[in-house]
Amino acid sequence: MRVQFWGARGSIAKPRPSTARYGGNTSCIEARSARGTLVVVDCGTGGHSLGQNLVSAGAEGVRGHILISHTHWDHIQGIPFFAPLFVPGNEWDIYGPKGLGQSLREALAGQMQYTYFPVPLDQCGAKIRYHDLVEGTFDIDDIKVSTRYLNHPALTLGYRLEADGVAVVYACDHEPHSRMLATCHADITGQDLRHAEFVNRADLLIHDAQYTAEEYPAKVGWGHRGRDGRHQ
């Protein structure tokens, strides 16, 4: 399985020379199996560049899947600018957590109302299917997808993709359930143990590490974790 990062930032895009090393766009990951199954995980502002790349490749009848972790803007802002959604003949399945107070489709359509964007979601040319998810496991062609709830202020899912003998785990916005675990050495129990089991033995782990150890104490409860390497 091949993975490419199109966006790794949080909150707001910051395209500038000082952010060039890791890029300035918000969350968007592309994963492809050896068979060619295309899965996009989150569609922040990095989704614009990915979409342009797919269109420039010239392929017709693109079939793809988008897994949305949650509907905070930095994870869905690329949807209105994701060019393959506007191409007739393309087919896309979009997945996201169930229980947002509205359907996934309604949440995504909200940011494309005329008040905010000139083209509504239902005028996209591609055929789009929407799937509201809970914790569980399902298959996208040859890719096995497992979901697990993360600890974040919005209802958020982490994704584990398994194909071609490897596993990729995407746990974008997550804070340890135990404050003791987040700030010092502690035994992993309860929901934190479930999370550890979910990410265990991943060949590639893409995980929240928003704050330095010095920053984190002032950000407890914000739904992100600090990074100090002790629990890697």
Annotated model-derived regions:
Residues 175-232:
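Cap/insert and terminal regions of metallo-dependent hydrolase folds
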Residues 1-182:
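Binuclear metal-dependent hydrolase catalytic cores
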